[in-house]
Curated annotation (Swiss-Prot):
Regions crossing the membrane: 521-541
Membrane topology: Single-pass type I membrane protein
GO terms classed as biological process: clathrin-dependent endocytosis of virus by host cell; fusion of virus membrane with host endosome membrane; fusion of virus membrane with host plasma membrane; virion attachment to host cell
Organism lineage: Viruses, Riboviria, Orthornavirae, Negarnaviricota, Polyploviricotina
Name this protein carries in UniProt: Hemagglutinin
Organism: Influenza A virus (strain A/Silky Chicken/Hong Kong/SF189/2001 H5N1 genotype A)
Length: 557
């Protein structure tokens, strides 16, 4: 007789996970395992970048630092920096009102510099024919007294004369040199002659690549910081073995110090109000540092260092495990785009904890779960390699630093913002589509592995067992634990059990045939009896109708 308890089932792992992922076909699919690839957290601090401290300018601007605003004395000499931090509206900018020519270009230059060495190129004491210490202003106070920018000299007439200046500096250093100078624009003609004696003045500056001639613009202006005059500052990069030549008969703000560019590298000027956090990171944003190996983040579009790519997404989760459908859940699930093919199995097994796919058997010796280690390990390796490949491809060093534009370049700035927004939209779309597609493929990959395991068992057992349609096989022979193990490891001996299985199949077939014969006899008897009863009823009705005249009966011979 058939031993119905001898069964083997193919199934998959389930657990108590509530992790959910999205696919092309479905949203919020619960899976056994998942990996978040979107970093959403930061520490809210400014940190060292790979062990190098940032240059945090506090209340000073880049212009205030480079020119030497008296309120920025703490930055007279600064060590190597990894990046520069400037507040959105620093208080200590150009203390004497005016402009810094090509300021945005200078900031762009600084984004590729990691260290300056300040050197004296024209000593203040060398201006014997001009007043080099009288050029101060109440707009630039220091310790309650009028002062001026530390790194340039405002030259004033001496003894009612302002002799024409002709000075040169030859860059004998091996490094490029950042040189700054300026011009003073008086409020009126009286101020012009009061300071410089000469009513008509000029400043000429020349290098191998620069040819500049400046004249003061005398005009009545509103007061800023108590000053109606204005100052305009300029800069150039002086190459090694090149010379810079100055000529002027008034209004000249001469360089005293210049900056030797001793180290170039990746840097940035970051706008942030944060304080230094005495920490280290590989990726810094204006919102805080990110320490993550994830390929994407949604913290801030501007970054410096080895950073994930910024996307506008709120959620990017990769499926690494299977659909989490414990066996107690009987409702039907939708299947995937690529033909998810393990739908014949009603649910996963929470009792199988040592693998993704495996078996459950039951026989006279008992029952139990066993994972298929080989298929599980291959699947783990495949999914892990895929996830790592995605992360490696996306997690390359990526910097996005802000660009600054002056008031005349607003249209360019707007166009630049639109282009950057467009790039971010494309990155976001690509990242989200990548996750949806890979999640679909991963879940279908798991379904395919379950189906392959099922087919492996089916091809071994052939007609020695019956497919029950729910992922299980019912043996036509007794299958002890040794037999069950042979099915699992692929060494099942079909001929050994085929005779016993054949006899049990025939016994089952005989029972079915005997039952079918009995049903046929009963059916024939029932049909004949019903027909005979109907004939008798019709004959009786006819005789009754003939006897009372309702029906005429004629017999013709």
């Amino acid at each position: 007789s058939l031993v119905k308890s001898d069964q083997i089932c193919i199934g998959y792992h389930a657990n108590n996970s509530t992790e959910q992922v999205d696919t092309i076909m479905e949203k919020n699919v619960t899976v056994t395992h998942a990996q978040d690839i979107l970093e959403k957290t930061h520490n809210g601090k400014l940190c060292d970048l790979d062990g190098v401290k940032p240059l945090i300018l506090r209340d000073c601007s880049v212009a205030g630092w480079l020119l030497g605003n008296p309120m920025c004395d703490e930055f007279i000499n600064v060590p190597e920096w990894s990046y520069i931090v400037e507040k959105a509206s620093p208080a200590n900018d150009l203390c004497y009102p005016g402009d810094f020519n090509d300021y945005e270009e200078l900031k762009h230059l600084l984004s590729r510099i990691n260290h300056f060495e300040k050197i004296q190129i024209i000593p203040k004491s060398s201006w014997s024919n001009h007043e080099a210490s009288s050029g101060v202003s109440s707009a630039c106070p220091y310790l309650g007294k009028s002062s001026f920018f530390r790194n340039v000299v405002w030259l004033i007439k001496k003894n009612s004369t302002y002799p024409t200046i002709k000075r040169s500096y030859n860059n004998t250093n091996q490094e490029d040199l950042l040189v700054l100078w300026g011009i003073h624009h008086p409020n009126d003609a009286a101020e012009q002659t009061k300071l410089y004696q000469n009513p008509t003045t000029y400043i000429s500056v020349g290098t191998s690549t620069l040819n500049q001639r400046l004249v003061p613009k005398i005009a009545t202006r509103s007061k800023v910081n108590g000053q109606s005059g204005r100052m305009e500052f300029f800069w150039t990069i002086l190459k090694p073995n090149d010379a810079i030549n100055f000529e002027s008969n008034g209004n000249f703000i001469a360089p005293e110090y210049a900056y030797k560019i001793v180290k170039k590298g990746d840097s940035a000027i970051m706008k942030s109000e944060l304080e230094y956090g005495n920490c280290n990171t590989k990726c810094q944003t204006p919102m805080g540092a990110i320490n993550s190996s994830m390929p994407f983040h949604n913290i801030h579009p501007l970054t410096i260092g080895e950073c994930p790519k910024y996307v506008k997404s709120n959620r990017l989760v990769l499926a690494t495990g299977l659909r989490n459908t414990p066996q107690r859940e009987r409702r039907r699930k939708k299947r995937g785009l690529f033909g998810a093919i393990a739908g014949f199995i009603e649910g996963g097994w929470q009792g199988m904890v040592d693998g993704w796919y495996g078996y459950h058997h039951s026989n006279e010796q008992g029952s139990g779960y066993a994972a298929d280690k080989e298929s599980t390990q291959k699947a783990i390796d495949g999914v892990t390699n895929k996830v790592n490949s995605i992360i490696d491809k996306m997690n390359t060093q990526f910097e996005a630093v802000g660009r600054e534009f002056n008031n005349l370049e607003r249209r360019i700035e707007n166009l630049n913002k639109k282009m950057e927004d467009g790039f971010l939209d494309v990155w976001t779309y690509n990242a989200e589509l990548l996750v949806l597609m890979e999640n679909e493929r991963t879940l279908d990959f798991h379904d395919s592995n379950v189906k392959n395991l099922y087919d492996k068992v089916r091809l071994q057992l052939r007609d020695n067992a019956k497919e029950l349609g729910n992922g299980c096989f019912e043996f036509y022979h007794k299958c002890d634990n040794e037999c069950m193990e042979s099915v699992k490891n692929g060494t099942y001996d079909y001929p050994q059990y085929s005779e016993e299985a054949r006899l049990n199949r025939e016994e089952i077939s005989g029972v079915k045939l005997e039952s079918m014969g009995t049903y046929q006899i009963l059916s024939i008897y029932s049909t004949v009896a019903s027909s005979l009863a109907l004939a008798i009823m019709v004959a009786g009705l006819s005789l009754w109708m003939c006897s009372n005249g309702s029906l005429q009966c004629r017999i013709c011979i």
